[in-house]
Amino acid sequence: MLKKAIFFGAHDDDVEIGCAGTAIKLKKKKFKIYKVIISSSGFKNEYGKTLRQNDIAEKEASRANKIIGFNECINLNEKTNEIIVNDLLKSKILKIINRINPSHIFVHWSGDVHHDHRVVSDLVLGLSKRIENVYLYRSNFFKSKKEFNGNIYIDITKEYKKKISSIEQYKTELKRVKNSWLKMVENENKINGYRSGCKYAECFEVIRSKIL
């Protein structure tokens, strides 16, 4: 049976930071891989200054998606930093899940400090009760009230360079954060690799995992 995995993210670049290595690895294992982004990903600061334009985010994401090799990418174009639970959004996500019928779903950790990440996590978890394999990832590493209970590590040593290349496509965001994301990802993946006996790894909190 053909295996399929959906990678959900609130914004363009979340999946790349949190689990691009795993996506690339699954693609090598003949999975069909899908990326679903909930927001348009452009945003302004508290003073109304545009920090990221929607069209630029879309172009950068397109380049990253090609590097990873997604079979299909979907953007639901909700407003960045204002994603809310509503029946229409639930319906859109459920239709995607039902159409693709994935064996695996990857989505944000529910304890994330970012509002959009938490909302997307809760939405997808609520709609994926029948999916056999569900994993939570982190796309930032800020301290939270909850502890991230990472309990599975995926060796991405061979996929690491391609993962970093996908993140590097988000030039506007990297410029804004002075490339700090790249070091953050390197440190996190190295630590996870050390913990699991390889050079680089991604860590996930397992909700469900069917081995046999």
Regions found by a protein language model. Name each.
Residues 2-6, 48, 72, 78-79, ...:
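Metal-dependent de-N-acetylase/amidase catalytic core
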